[in-house]
Regions:
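N-terminal Rossmann-like or analogous alpha/beta NTP/dinucleotide-binding catalytic cores
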Residues: 2-141, 287, 300
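Internal, conserved structured core segments that host functional sites
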Residues: 119-171, 175, 195
Length: 340
């Protein structure tokens, strides 16, 4: 327990990703790589958000498989379980318990305005369930249980984090200083990777076009094929130049190449001067293949060691539950529940 108390003195950061599909190159370069580089700086909590996944119908066996695959990929990407708390959301019941309480302090109008609810409802019109509507209240519980200083946020989650901050203000206004106000964490570095087939939209594991996303566990030949087919630009220039406004396809490929090689945009422009897209696209593919090779091999090895994987998620849930329970007890006392 002493180690747990010591860890709490560091600034706390928390994030979760739904195991609704394989992790993408965008997830790695935009978030996970950055998290791994900051494991000494913060007390980090990273979880597989399996409870959020079931707001959309899931195949149970596939969800279990993807949850463990995602955990293995987290570790293979450099999130050391000795330095980070890695756990499965459904293994920490306090998430659901605090989620219910926060539902009662979240206004119907606030939830109605969430753009993600509108988007997902449009895509899943046959299954507009209550969980989809109250998803942001559970997300607020995910965050507030661990009293984090920072929450890494993507563009698609900014609105939910703002709602979380509104809930903190409302709850603390009634009951005093219960929750710490979380700040959005926007890293100084971290590539924003766009779809290879539509460079105006973010690379996503839910992309309907399979050629738009690169997955961490993908075969090298498939990665190379996708990069060769990647959208460049319809200009007649056929030169590698960083111009996000007029050449978004090339700019996206340059962003990826820069992120995996460490080269600046100027260096990339010089390297491919006079060579055109025909030479550039396979070079980006080769660089990505070599970056992902050790991750894929390590994730495969970890998945084969079921005892190790189980020890990681059990230890993670134990530590997460210890911290979460302290917050939940405080909340239950404030709202008037009899202590158990």
């Amino acid at each position: 327990m002493e180690n747990m108390e010591n860890a709490a003195r560091k600034k706390v950061m928390l994030s979760g990703i739904q195991p609704s599909g394989d992790l993408t190159l965008g997830s790695y370069l935009g978030a996970i790589k950055n998290w791994a580089e900051r494991d000494e700086e913060f007390d980090n909590y990273y979880f597989m958000a399996d409870m959020h996944s079931i707001t959309v119908r899931q195949d149970p066996a596939a969800l279990r498989r993807r949850t463990l695959e995602q955990l293995a990929q987290y570790i293979a990407c450099g999130l050391d379980p000795e330095k980070n708390t890695l756990f499965i959301q459904s293994h920490v019941p306090q998430h659901a318990e605090l989620g219910w309480v926060l539902n009662c302090y979240t206004m119907f109008g606030e939830l109605s305005r969430m753009t993600q609810f509108k988007d997902k409802s449009a895509k899943n019109s046959e299954n507009i369930n209550g969980g989809l509507f109250t998803y942001p209240a559970l997300m607020a519980a995910d965050i507030l249980l661990y009293q984090p200083d920072y929450v890494p946020v993507g563009e698609d989650q900014k609105q939910h984090v703002e709602l979380c901050r509104n809930i903190v203000q409302r709850f603390n206004g009634i009951y005093g200083d219960v929750f710490k106000m979380p700040e959005p964490y926007i890293p100084k570095v971290g590539a924003r990777v766009m779809s290879l087939s539509d460079p105006t939209s973010k690379m996503s594991k839910s992309d309907k076009d399979p050629n738009g996303s690169i997955y961490l566990m993908e075969k090298p030949e498939d990665i190379l094929r996708k990069f060769k087919r990647a959208v460049t630009d319809s200009d007649t220039e056929n030169c590698v130049r960083y111009d996000p406004e007029h050449k978004p396809g090339v700019a996206n490929l340059m962003t990826i190449y820069s992120a995996v090689t460490g080269k600046s945009f100027d260096e990339i422009e010089q390297e491919f001067a006079g060579k055109g897209y025909g030479a550039f696209k396979p070079a980006v593919g080769d660089a990505v293949v070599e970056t992902l090779r050790p991750i894929r091999e390590e994730a495969t090895r970890i998945l084969g060691d079921k005892a190790y994987l189980e020890s990681v998620y059990r230890a993670g849930a134990q530590k997460a539950s210890y911290v979460a329970e302290k917050t939940l007890r405080k909340v239950y006392k404030k709202v008037g529940f009899v202590a158990r």
